[in-house]
Amino acid sequence: MEKTDTIILSPEELAAYMAESTISVTSTYEHSPVVLMVDDTVIGTLGNFSASIGKAKSKKTFNVSAIVASALSGSSVLHYRSTFPENKRKILYIDTEQGRYHCQLVLKRILRLADLPEYKNPDNLIMLALRKFSPKLRLAIVEQAIGTIPDLGLVIIDGIRDFLYDINSSSESTDIISKFMQWTDDRQIHIHTVLHQNKNDEHARGHIGTELNNKAETIMQVEVDKEDKTVSVVEAVHIRDREFEPFAFRINEEAMPEPVGSYLPKEKKIGRPTKEPFEPYKEIPENVHQAALDAAFANGNISNYNDYLERLKIGYRLQDVNLGHNKAVKVATFLRNKRMVIKVGKEYQINPEYHY
C-alpha cells in the first residue's frame, strides 16, 4: 500500500491524485457493500470503519468476539449478522493490550462462538498480539498486514489508543484516523476498533475519541447495566443507519457471552431532550478560537490561571461567544490539549506551532 506521509509530491503526481479524486456526474459509483448488522440495522460497510467504546471492565472484548465470530461463521452471534463477500472472508484481529496467553483465550472464545474446532487454527482468521511493540512499530506492522493479506474483509483493532504516544495529540490522532480512511478505501475493508471511555463521563477518551466520533460510520457503547452488574448493554451512540434496539449480554459459567433475553431497553426520557455537553471542538470553529486568542493575548502573556480564564472570556465574547466559568475551564482544557496555548514556567502563551 502506498504511504504518502511527509513526502513531497511533484506537480504531475498531484495532478494524478486530483484526477483520481474527481467525481463525475456521468460515472457510476457503487454503494458500499453492507457487511455487518445488528439485527436489521447496518453498522458496517466495506470502505468504512466503526468502533466500540466503553469503560474498563464493561466487556468490550467479549462484544467484539461476537462480531468476529459472526463474520467468521457467517451466522448470527448475539445480535450480530455478517454478509461478507466470498473474496472478503479473511479477518485480521489486532490486540495491543494483552499478552499472548490472554490473546489465545480470546481466539478460543471466538472459535467456540463460531462453532469451530479449537484444536486447529482457522483458515480465515489471523490474530496478532502487538503489546510488546512501540506505537510506531505497531502501526507499521498493521499497515504491512493490511496491505498484504489476500481476501481481507474485516480488521479488528483492540485498541486504537496504543497506536499513539499521546492520546490528546491532535496531530497523532488525525494521522491515525487518516490511516483508517486510507486503509479502508484502498483495500475496501471494514475496520472495527475499540477505545476506552473517560472515567467521569460518556465520551471516548482523548482527541482520538473526538476524531472517531466525527469520522466513524458507527459508534457503539458497551456499558455495565446500572441495576445488574453481571449484564452489559450494547447501544448505538452515533450511527448513519437507523438506531438498533439496545441489547444485553452476560458472561455464562463457561466464560462465554450469551444474550439476556429478558432485557428491556430503558425508556427514553419524555419532555425536552437533555442538552448535549459543551464541546469547544464541535461548537466553536478554528478561526473563532484563533481570533479569540489573539484578543485574549493582545497585551502579551498571562501570568496566572484566573487572569487567563478572564481574558479568555473577554476574547471569546468579542467573537460573540459567551463563556461562563465552567465553559471557560472547558475551553482552557481544550486549548491545552490542542497545544494552542502552552504554559511556560508560570506564564500562559500562544503556541504558534500548534496543529488543529
What are these regions (language model features)?
Residues V155-D158, H190-L195, V341:
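Short beta-strand segments at enzyme active-site cores
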Residues P85-N168:
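Conserved inter-motif catalytic segment of the P-loop NTP-binding fold
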Residues S70-S75, I110-L113, F163-D166, W183, ...:
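Conserved, well-folded catalytic cores of nucleic-acid-processing
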